[in-house]
A protein has these predicted regions:
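Ser/Thr/Gly/Pro-rich low-complexity, disordered linker/stalk segments of secreted
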Residues: 1-32
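Extracellular/luminal regions of secreted and cell-surface proteins that mediate adhesion/ECM remodeling
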Residues: 5, 322-465
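Boundary/entry segment of secreted carbohydrate-active catalytic domains
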Residues: 24-80, 85
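Aromatic-lined substrate-binding rim segments of carbohydrate-active enzymes
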Residues: 67-125, 135-138, 210
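An active-site-proximal structural segment forming one wall of the substrate-binding cleft
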Residues: 100-113, 133-160, 191-205
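Active-site groove signature of glycoside hydrolases
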Residues: 119-128, 145-189
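Aromatic-lined carbohydrate-recognition surfaces of secreted/lumenal glycan-active proteins
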Residues: 156-167, 199, 203-223
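Substrate-binding cleft of secreted/luminal carbohydrate-active enzymes
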Residues: 216-334
Length: 465
């Protein structure tokens, strides 16, 4: 196959070990020199959070049969992702009309207004037939889709590679995009060349903030021999845990090892097969071993083969739901007790990602000081990126946030609040798209989650003199 398009930048370095407490002078100017500290209790409760977890459905066809009630029902259930399946059957040999692109844009707006995001799939044949389009036509469609996808990147954290073959799963193509199983006389050389065209078109036209999930491990290994060489192309496994080979997904232990390494830095999600090979690996022991091993980030809530029922009956469903993707836990906070107006103060926050997977979209910690009487606020955003936090962490990482206090700031006591808003303009101010920490309220210590502002009140006080 032709060489892949240049890989995105390498993954952020794993989070460092907790830093030693800074000296009082570091980042502080005009402060009391006296520290106040607090620790936080974790919670094991399921926490609905964007870009992760079980996903619902947005209807049988995202453009032509959008199901607003289903999307709202998924939100009410605690899901924050919906499967957006876009049917392109009518356009196998033609351009996408402007009316279609306008309608697609409107559907994303509906998802946004519902507080949801999507896992997106474009396909020409959502059946075993594989009646797809040529690689050239797929490339053309992706070029047409580019502006709509870019305008709605905030609600497209994940996109399956799609387009090719049966169900958009990159096998059984009737247009020369696969070889072997159910692919006619197409040679593998021809199929590889066509698949590379589609791969490059996906990378070129899908927003850089969107993770792209390919179906076939062998393709990924061929394109990216090292599983750590890029951070954008991951895997969608339509037959996760569905028999010894995941119903033909893997042909060797080496392929499994590669995907486990790949998914440390790129998104891995999927579903179970309705017609899975046997025996299934659907026990709690199975998912609690393989979920973290593959860094499972998101998963179909439909119980195709009794997997979810098995997890529920085994008593682990809540743990699975709470562990998929990231799970951001606050451990502690420290800062000086007072600062002069016009001075600066350093707030040190200890936290960790105890979820099965990384953050895949850029996020940053925000510290807000809120005056107890006037409500005036002073905010600062931490440098860096929460994607650097390694998943399944067993120790804290310290994030130090310097805050400049305006000379004209209101004097008096301020509460300290912590938040992680979305980075996109369209959703940054919407509390439904902010990350909720995996911490329990403790009203006696003044530690409370504020759902309206999507901020955690740390229970500490800072006086501005």
């Amino acid at each position: 196959a032709p060489a892949p398009a240049p890989a995105p930048a390498p993954a952020p370095a794993p989070a460092p070990a907790p830093a030693p407490a800074p000296s009082p002078a570091t980042g502080n100017n005009g402060t009391s020199g006296i520290d106040t500290t607090a620790t936080f209790a974790r919670t094991t409760a399921e926490i609905p959070n964007p870009d992760r977890g079980f996903y619902g459905w947005a209807g049988s066809d995202f453009v032509n049969a959008y199901d607003a009630a289903s999307v709202q029902g998924a939100y009410n259930t605690g899901y924050r992702l919906v499967f957006a399946k876009v049917q392109l059957d009518a356009y196998r040999t033609s351009d996408l009309p402007s009316s279609f692109l306008t309608a697609l844009n409107a559907r994303f707006a509906q998802v946004r207004s519902a507080g949801m995001k999507t896992t997106l799939l474009f396909n020409y044949d959502f059946s075993g037939g594989g009646n797809d389009a040529t690689a050239a036509q797929i490339k053309r469609h992706l070029e047409q889709l580019r502006p709509v996808l870019a305008a709605n990147a905030d609600v497209i954290p994940y996109m399956r590679a799609g387009f090719i073959g049966a169900w958009g799963e990159w096998h059984s193509s009737k247009s020369g995009n696969s070889c072997g199983y159910n692919s006619g006389t197409t040679t593998c050389a021809t199929a590889d060349a066509n698949r590379a065209i589609v791969r490059d078109a996906l990378i070129a036209n899908v927003p850089a903030t969107t993770q792209i999930g390919f179906r076939i491990p062998a393709d990924l290994i061929k394109w990216y021999p090292s599983p750590t060489q890029q951070t954008r192309v991951g895997m969608h496994n339509d037959c996760f845990q569905s028999g010894p080979t995941d119903s033909g997904t893997y042909s060797s232990t080496a392929q499994r090892s590669y995907i486990q390494a790949l998914s440390l830095n790129t998104a891995f999600g999927g579903e179970n097969c309705a017609d899975a090979e046997k025996p299934l690996r659907n026990s709690c022991a199975d998912i609690l071993s393989e979920g973290p091993a593959y860094h499972l980030a998101w998963f179909n809530s439909s119980d195709w083969a009794g997997f979810i029922s098995s997890w529920r009956n085994g008593g682990c469903l809540s743990q699975v739901a709470g562990s998929m993707g990231y799970r951001l836990q606050l451990d502690g906070i420290a800062h000086h007790t007072a600062v002069a107006a016009g001075g600066s103060i350093l707030v040190n926050v200890d936290l960790r990602n105890v979820g099965w997977a990384r953050f895949f979209t850029q996020r940053a910690l925000v510290v807000t000081l809120r005056h107890r009487s006037t409500g005036a606020t002073i905010s600062a955003t931490a440098a860096g990126d929460l994607r650097t936090l390694a998943p399944q962490a067993t120790s804290s990482t310290r994030i130090s946030v310097p805050i400049a206090i305006p000379a004209g700031a209101d004097k008096g006591d301020y509460d300290v609040l912590l938040s992680v808003p979305d980075i996109f303009v369209a959703t940054a101010g919407n509390p439904r798209y902010a990350v909720r920490f995996a911490n329990a309220d403790n009203t006696s210590l003044g530690q409370v989650w504020d759902g309206t502002g999507a901020r955690f009140k740390a229970g500490t006080t800072l006086r501005v003199n």
